[in-house]
């Protein structure tokens, strides 16, 4: 069994890590840390996990094969020395995802820049071989995952794209703040970040394409939809062929048939799963390509992708513990 520790288990991503790993047939959870909730059973914070015999601890003195860092941005770089060399590490923060110059442009000063190059960017569909040999993996951001996977087949066709993102309330994490309380958050379609979103850095690093995000908060709890626009003179058939690079990927589904309830990707149809649904439309008259990407920000955009990376790092079937279909209806 793989002995697993989760550092920072009280947030939504931490809760999903506990849920997924508790059901994983090759995993034993040896520790879940939280300074605020140390000593309390995990279901006191994550009510859906009632019946799971785990308590939070503030003690980092554990014996683990892999450690998931599910702490806020800026915290992993402060904690990393506690764990380096003792276990494989999968970091779910932004601290080690992008090169030093990009980090400083989008986030500010990095406290451990010498470690950035030691981390593999944990997007399996692009970096599977590197992840397999890695000791340190930086889990991608949720928005970045959606956009990179949608854009990657077309990265040689354009140097610049516009990206419209519709994101859920859970994407903002669990910290209470006034805009996130129910009377303020309910029924909104709110411009959250009109430009210079931090996840643009990951897209630029991984595709070489400058992506200009405009992010809207919408009235859903989980899930996101990315709509990507660029111009290209061609035809829809050839564009669809490019997406076939994903035909053997276990967690990418191409939404190309236009019958039934789903004509294009919709986060409603991926909730609770590690799937990404990709689709495309081509406005031939205006030479405009529109690519769609939908995922669950807490699963493929977070905990699920981290478990997928763990599976690869330990030589397991990467779908292990993740091979279930989305919830429906929701």
From Swiss-Prot:
One of its GO terms (molecular function) is NADP+ binding. GO terms for biological process: arginine biosynthetic process via ornithine; L-arginine biosynthetic process; lysine biosynthetic process via aminoadipic acid. It comes from the Archaea. It is found in: Cytoplasm. The keyword Oxidoreductase applies. Keywords: Amino-acid biosynthesis, Arginine biosynthesis, Cytoplasm, Lysine biosynthesis, NADP, Oxidoreductase. Its EC number is 1.2.1.103, 1.2.1.106. GO terms for cellular component: cytoplasm. Its main location: cytoplasm. Pfam families: Semialdhyde_dh, Semialdhyde_dhC_1. It catalyses: [amino-group carrier protein]-C-terminal-N-(1-carboxy-5-oxopentan-1-yl)-L-glutamine + phosphate + NADP(+) = [amino-group carrier protein]-C-terminal-N-(1-carboxy-5-phosphooxy-5-oxopentan-1-yl)-L-glutamine + NADPH + H(+); [amino-group carrier protein]-C-terminal-gamma-(L-glutamyl-5-semialdehyde)-L-glutamate + phosphate + NADP(+) = [amino-group carrier protein]-C-terminal-gamma-(5-phospho-L-glutamyl)-L-glutamate + NADPH + H(+). SUPFAM superfamilies: Glyceraldehyde-3-phosphate dehydrogenase-like, C-terminal domain, NAD(P)-binding Rossmann-fold domains. Pathway: Amino-acid biosynthesis; L-lysine biosynthesis via AAA pathway; L-lysine from L-alpha-aminoadipate (Thermus route): step 3/5; Amino-acid biosynthesis; L-arginine biosynthesis. NADP(+) binds at residues 10-13, 297. SMART domains: Semialdhyde_dh (SM00859). The active site is at residue 142. Involved in both the arginine and lysine biosynthetic pathways. Belongs to the NAGSA dehydrogenase family. Type 1 subfamily. LysY sub-subfamily. This is Putative [LysW]-L-2-aminoadipate/[LysW]-L-glutamate phosphate reductase.
